[in-house]
Swiss-Prot record:
Belongs to the arenaviridae nucleocapsid protein family. It is an enzyme of class 3 (hydrolase). The gene is N. Its EC number is 3.1.13.-. It comes from Mobala mammarenavirus (isolate Rat/Central African Republic/Acar 3080/1983). Mn(2+) binds at residues 388, 390, 532. This is Nucleoprotein. It holds the Pfam family Arena_ncap_C. The lineage of its organism: Viruses, Riboviria, Orthornavirae, Negarnaviricota, Polyploviricotina. GO terms for biological process: negative stranded viral RNA replication; RNA-templated viral transcription; symbiont-mediated suppression of host cytoplasmic pattern recognition receptor signaling pathway via inhibition of IKBKE activity. InterPro entries: Nucleocapsid_arenaviridae, Nucleocapsid_C_arenaviridae, Nucleocapsid_C_sf, Nucleocapsid_N_arenaviridae. Residues 54-240 are annotated as: Binding site for the cap structure m7GTP. GO terms for cellular component: helical viral capsid; host cell cytoplasm; ribonucleoprotein complex; viral nucleocapsid. Homomultimerizes to form the nucleocapsid. Binds to viral genomic RNA. Interacts with glycoprotein G2. Interacts with protein Z; this interaction probably directs the encapsidated genome to budding sites. Interacts with protein L; this interaction does not interfere with Z-L interaction. Interacts with host IKBKE (via Protein kinase domain); the interaction inhibits IKBKE kinase activity.
Amino acid sequence: MSNSKEIKSFLWTQSLRRELSGFCTNTRVQVIKDAQSLLHGLDFSEVSNIQRLMRKEKRDDSDLKRLRDLNQTVNNLVELKSSQQKNTLRVGALTSDDLLVLAADLDRLKAKVNRSERPLTGGVYMGNLTQQQLDQRKILLQLVGMGGSRVPPRGGDGIVRVWDVRNPDLLNNQFGTMPSLTLACLCKQGQEDLSDVVKALTDLGLVYTAKYPNLSDLDKLTHTHPVLGLIDGNKSAINISGYNFSLNAAVKAGASLLDGGNMLETIKVTPKNIDTILKCVLKVKRSVGMFVSDTPGERNPYENILYKICLSGDGWPYIACRTSISGRAWDNTEVDLGTNKDPINKGPPTSNKTAGAAGFNAGLTYSQMMELKDSMLQIDPTAKTWVDIEGRADDPVEIAIYQPSNGHYIHFYREPTDIKQFRQDAKYSHGIDVQDLFTTQPGLTSAVLENLPKNMVLTCQGVEDIRKLLDSQGRKDIKLIDVSMQKADARKFEHQIWDEYKHLCSMHTGIVVEKKKRGGKEEITPHCALLDCLMFEATTRNSLDIVIPRPVLSKDLVFRSATPKVIL
């Protein structure tokens, strides 16, 4: 981290301390009391065993059960703990603008945390390989034609950490550090007097009042307090447990021992003051320009306090035991924007044109955009890729992108702007009901086309409209190959494709007719962008033997939420 980033981050911390000083409490006595309780009641042979499990190359459900059992014992022995609390934030102490900011920032934070804790794309090996092994694996995969694969980022010690468990939700809230537990472990496992440990961590906390203690500071303090030599200077990896001796854990413990220091670690949140605390946090956000960072990894001070306060809302968010809490911050905090409609009087679907007035986002949210980017990593930039659209180049209503080599496809819809022209196209081409498009996700066309790999080559049956669409979205770098099949040839396998893959699309509900050269009309099969791609591929191969199609986008991305109420 650069010095400017460190200074800015600490500026945020200092500003938050000043603004939230009225919510700080004296926790020194209770932290020491809880540490004594842990020293007398905790089985430190099991603590040592848990520390061993955290060093294993593979951790499974049995390891998680042992960790959760020990965490429950710790929870039963301490008094500083946070309680399960569902928070509903409404207009009051917080204005409607405040609520919108909180909703947006929690949404961004959710996306960041999810990106930090999961691989960038499906199918990535998440075992405990060293970075050297992962680099060799990448070379080998490229050798066998799987060059699109990506490797997850490594942890601070060169090991990719992973829990191989059936229910990942059981991992939530099981890894935070607690000052009382840090004190107890340093005392027992370092064979030091509790009073010496308290003095050492208090001095570390005093340094923290002026700066973030670093390894150089730790080394100097170790000359006076040898127990600090147990502190591990390596950066903590994700999901490694609260029983480690990290510098962050020691600094947090030191801060909790400073009565009167206005340390964020001593803040106590209750259902009565949570709105006021968040109001103060937003005041600091505006004054010093705090924000939720796009970069996955450690949380900055604003992200940290926002997450911790919204996780429980009842207790000491930084230092209390929270292993009994289920869910994440966005699960336990609801932002009520006051835009709910009575579901009993539910009318026809709301058009995207009026969705903004009903409280809907005009485009993709931050978390949706992050999900879209992650999902589109499944697209192989070098593979043969079909593209087809329904509607006009300047007003498309259905777009499909399909890769026959792996079966991956992107398929979504768009509400038209020219309803009169749409009805003509529906009658003679696609047969889509405009009301079925009112719940489609606005902004998805631009987002998908923007995130297609650079200089990609797309194959199509008819190039003019697709070229215009791509150019309108600034994607002149994408090249097009027009197969230019005769109409009858292109639709050679139409009935077989519809028989086999009709379940992939249910939007083409209308009757479509075709004008005959000698007059009159004939009913024909509607044109579906996705199924057209499948039949074009079947025609070029003269075979129906194709890879099972697999959607890249989730349904939640293709269709917007049915209610404007934001649940975080």
